[in-house]
Amino acid sequence: MKCYFTDHRGEQSPTDGTTLSLTSPESTEESVEVFWPGTIQREGSSPRPGPAIPREEGLYFAARDRGMRDWSSSPSSESSEYQSYSQYQSCCSCMCDEDNAAPQSVCAFYTHVQTVRGVAVAWETEAGFEPVTRKPRIHEAQFIKRQRWNGSSFEMASNTDMRWDLEACKSNCSPEPEDIDLLECCLQELREPPDWLVTTNYGVRCVACCRVLPSLDALLEHAQHGIREGFSCQIFFEEMLERRRAQGQAHDQQLEEEQSPSDNSECSRPQGEVLSAQQQEKQ
């Protein structure tokens, strides 16, 4: 019995055994037509080397492979989207909290100073104005606390907090680009030195940055809005207040511990006196 194989071009070739004829290069799928005497049977695809996988399963595995590749690259994008969303949420929550938060007051620490012979600086002590080698007399003045972003603490100096404030200050206070060039040309020769470079006979010195300011109002303005100049002393003042509060709590706790043994001794004294009186009566 002989079997005939026919390719897509319609050519027949008698064979003594089983022979496979491949399709033409133009075709995208391989198929073989097998003719037996008396019967005609068509097979969908020719066998390939390796395990036989049906067309539906091949499509399934290809889609699965493509999905796994997509999944392997998706976590980075999802994480970036999650980070941006979390940053947006934190920013919105901080803005809402900032609007709803009541203004708080903070103490600014300063000392009075004066110049000696126009060069040396003497600050105020308990005995009067003396050289800076002596212990100064520290004064306090309250100012409205600048609202900070949530998440900032004393241990982590809020660089992010300052960056947001600087950007907001630049967006609100910066003039137009054309006006900047005009001002630079006009004020190049008329520019005056900043007030903190001018030597004054009398002023107040900020304990945080050691800057001498002409008046107390200027000091409070510096303490509250110093972020406009690229730095802020408010974090230092908050840290000082926090440490003072912690020292006060430790001192109160120490006093309570000292008072508690004295109370116990006072309670034990009457009992000792009663016992001694009973012993004397027995004798």
Curated annotation (Swiss-Prot):
Keyword Ion transport applies: no
Q: How does it assemble?
A: Interacts with GOPC.
Q: Where is the composition biased (Basic and acidic residues)?
A: 1-11
Q: Which GO terms describe its biological process?
A: fertilization; positive regulation of acrosome reaction; regulation of fertilization
* Keywords, in A-Z order: Cytoplasmic vesicle, Membrane
Output this protein's name: Protein FAM170B
Pfam (any one): Spt46
Q: Which domain of life is it from?
A: Eukaryota
Signal peptide region:
none
Q: Which organism is it from?
A: Homo sapiens (Human)
What is the protein's known function?
Plays a role in fertilization through the acrosome reaction.
Where in this protein does the record put region Disordered?
A: 1-58, 246-283
Family from the record? Belongs to the FAM170 family.
Q: Quote the subcellular location field of this record.
A: Cytoplasmic vesicle, Secretory vesicle, Acrosome; Cytoplasmic vesicle, Secretory vesicle, Acrosome outer membrane
**Where is this chain primarily localised?**
cytoplasm
GO CC aspect terms: acrosomal vesicle; outer acrosomal membrane
Please describe the organ and tissue distribution of this protein's expression: Exclusively expressed in adult testis.
